[in-house]
Amino acid sequence: MNPLTNIKNIYFIGIGGIGMSALARYFNTQGVVVSGYDKTPTALTDDLVKEGIRIHFEDDINQIDKAATVVVYTPAIPASHYELNYCKDNGYNVVKRSDVLNWITENAFTIAIAGTHGKTTTTSMTAHILRHSGYGCNAFLGGIATNYGTNFWSHEKNVVVVEADEYDRSFLKLAPNVAVITAVDPDHLDIYGTAEEVLKAFGQYTDKIKSNGVLIQKYGTEFPINTANKEVFTYAYKEPKASFHTSDLKVIDGSYQFDLVHPKGIVNNVVLNMGGLHNVENATAAMAIALQLGIDENKIKEAVASFQGVKRRFEFKIKTANKVLIDDYAHHPEELNALISGVRSLYPNEKMVLVFQPHLYSRTQDQAAGFIEILSKADEVILLPIYPARELPIPGVSSDILLDKMTVAKKTVMRSEERRVGKECLRLCR
């Protein structure tokens, strides 16, 4: 029996995380009593409270709902966490977020988008196309879809679109009908150890595809694949050898217009009102999924044109005739490269000032050479102190290891990020 059947009260440790909050919203819509802990209040936890979910911000076992029968946590929670250990030691059914996603998706038609970058926008765009076209889906997103102001929505149709997270090998708990792989660049080496282990995990992910399922992978990604009992397609921004690719790309009034070439024909004059050439490629993947599902081409075009993006993914904060401020979550060298290329494609003659906060000590150390090369493509770089997230500091690893070797003419490290970042951005946009 699926464990979902008997859940009446559920507790989340780390409820404010983007993936955890989507699950909390799911159970809340199902009439389950939902509560949880997080370290810091945020706009997202504020929204959850407004939706009727009780949240506290102290690691305090007295605030755990003792009626909860399932406790969910993420790998971001440290092993020493008091509440987590209390629940493990006192008979609660303690499971990871990935286990719960497995319960939700195992009996559904599941579309899972994985990749070391690009998956959040691709997942959000795919879910938007299915929703806007009337096809319908339940969506579990790794970001806040701007069109809807949320990372989750439900639908009576037993179709799930889910972002498949490779961190901690969580995506291996899923068994999708349609699997997408956007990128396999080395990342999370604190978990995997080597780039080879990352590729091996993506190969294992393709083994999880249900019989007669579909794999859609970015053209040029190479990793071990078992092609038995599945259709395999490729996609790319403009590689003509890919099953799905773009052609005749133009920039018109700040938007992209292109044709989508696919195995059965061409979808002409697609309009994407979202910056970044990498997002043209993400749109190609999302449209490939929709075409595989048999959604009408005109409905797909309408949906893509109406897609407003994802919060912190090439998000325009200021857009005037002479100043533009873009907020983006890019935290891997390839993501940064895509961001810079996308900005240059829209504003080829403008000065680019890049304010960058490295994410994780381990990633900064492992990817330092890539960060140095890509950051040097900007005209000016302002670095912030490393955001540690789940990690403790690593001796000798700071933003200075990037600063010292960048070849950009103007560069600095902002030693205290509070307030000064906002003031600096406002100064740049005056």
Where are these regions (language model features)?
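Short acidic low-complexity segments
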Residues: R54-K66, E417-R420
